[in-house]
Amino acid sequence: MKTPRLYTLLVLLLMAGGVTMQAQIRIDKQQCFGGFGQEFCVGMALEDDYILLVGNTARDYAGTGHVTQNCNESRPGDPCWIMKIDHDYEIIDNWCYGDMGFSDGVGFIFKIGDKNEYYLTGSGFPDICDNNAQNLNIVAKRINADGEVIWTRGFGTQMGLSYDHVANGELAHDGGLLCHANYHSGGCDISHYYGNGDGWIVALDSLGNMNWETTLGTLGQDNLYHVERSSRGGYLVTMTADPVGNNYGNLSPCSSSIPMNMNGLIVKLDDVGNVEWNACYGSTRENPEEGCGFNTVLELEDGGYICCGDAYGETGDLAGSGWHYGTLHNIPNGDLTTDAWLLRLDENRNVIWSKCYGGSNFDFSFKVFPMKDGGFMVFGATYSNNGDVASAAHLNLADENDSAGWVFRTDANGNLLWERCIGAVGNGQTYFKDVVQHNDREYTIAGIVRCASSAIYSGDIDCSNCAVTHNPDDPFGGRSLDYWILHITDTVDYTTLQVPERPMPKEEAVVEIYPNPTNNTVCVLLPNEAEATEMELINMSGQVVATKTFSGKGSWMEMGDLPKGMYMLRIRNAEVCLTRKVLRE
């Protein structure tokens, strides 16, 4: 394989605040795989001596490029395609399954214990429910490391999946498999349907037999996105919910103050799919243009949660989040664009902080990893070239682009430390789909890339296989989408990295905070008298440990009973809004 150029240092100018920092993401190696058609990689499995990349390939181009297998079965859709490579990204083998595949709703892979066997989940056309394989439904397989099928199962309804066609999954606590998708009808395998779109989960044992199934929904439109095993037993589910359906179904009502917006929803299930609790988060404005949703929720060591997804709005749980206003194609009064969104909750599911990241175009986050220092590493995508996305400058991303992969790092309070776009010059043309964390510094990413036709436009893309995937008979250059795998290393020196502050008026610069360090009390002296000044003391886990409101020019915070360490002191009134570090000795 070909080793790419190493990016040992990237200087990022953070536009919000004008703070210059050093962000060092090194691309250690990368490679691309595909045929002459479109290949969509959606997942991977990493083993000691091989890697499986899983997604789908264009049926009409099977047998071209690296797609050496012919998957032309009679069923419609693009087949699931698996590429087996070594850790130098050299090809070992590849194979496909023609009975499983449609758009990007195929090929999610899950390792089964310590066996070299795997579950695959996706969508296909199984012959179930007397529908004669006419509609898309859930398909699950169990395979070995050589692609041999141990069993295949299909589940669903006669009417088939809802519009998004995506069927995903998660390993069950008992070694089986959970499959989930969204449906607009009931019957057959689905025992309950509440109306207008529900999420459905079916649990299989290791032999592919159904253990249990459950529907999550209301009379409104409810969409299920992700299921995660809980370390406390049962499962955590992320959804979006429409509160118009609050009065019917198995989900507790969202707040009546959020009457028209799609809201982020977390649902806790027990081991057999019964709802234990659910919690809603989102906007409070009576405007259907505002909304939010979660792609992932993780449990943290302190008992709390971190959620990542996307959001657009400025009220409710999004108030003060820093959402960047934007509209689709910059059309005045057009549809609002989303930011990547992180929501930090305590053990009782109360909001600790809510932060948005992005620019004036669409930005998303789908994967978050807690760091040992309390911060978070986040992976997603961006179409923006402004706002927080200062690194778009190194790709010269156009206002209208095809998306760049985006990775950014925060501290424990959600403050952005650095960010990095990874893609091609001009149009980006890269999408992250799956990430495996090796440690706090190293990650393997699987995704999709459109190989550049010229080194001038390649940017971060440096695959030696691109020529193999180009169709020579295509008058437009044959630059189709391909599987993409890359290994990156975070080389930032966090001992010298400073948290960026928002721009401050000149009068804020003379706010006095003393003594600092302190072993008991910290005093605050403002430049002018204020009727109401709020102070919050926040620990490095992002928790507010003390609050106080005062009038006048000065006051103090007691810290003598707090553990020694670094804290963030946030001060806000009509003239002042700033955060400063305070050391408790």
Language-model region placement:
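Residue-level detector of intrinsically disordered/flexible regions characterized by low predicted structural confidence
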Residues: 4-7, 86, 143-146, 252, ...
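Serine/threonine-rich, low-complexity intrinsically disordered segments
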Residues: 5, 10, 22, 70, ...
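Bacterial Sec-dependent N-terminal signal peptides
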Residues: 1-27, 499, 577-579
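N-terminal processing/targeting junctions
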Residues: 15-16, 20, 60, 89, ...
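A sequence-level/structural motif corresponding to short, flexible coil/turn segments enriched
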Residues: 22-503
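Intrinsically disordered, low-complexity regions enriched for glutamine and histidine
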Residues: 3, 20-22, 435, 541, ...
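C-terminal outer-membrane/trafficking sorting elements
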Residues: 503-514, 518-585
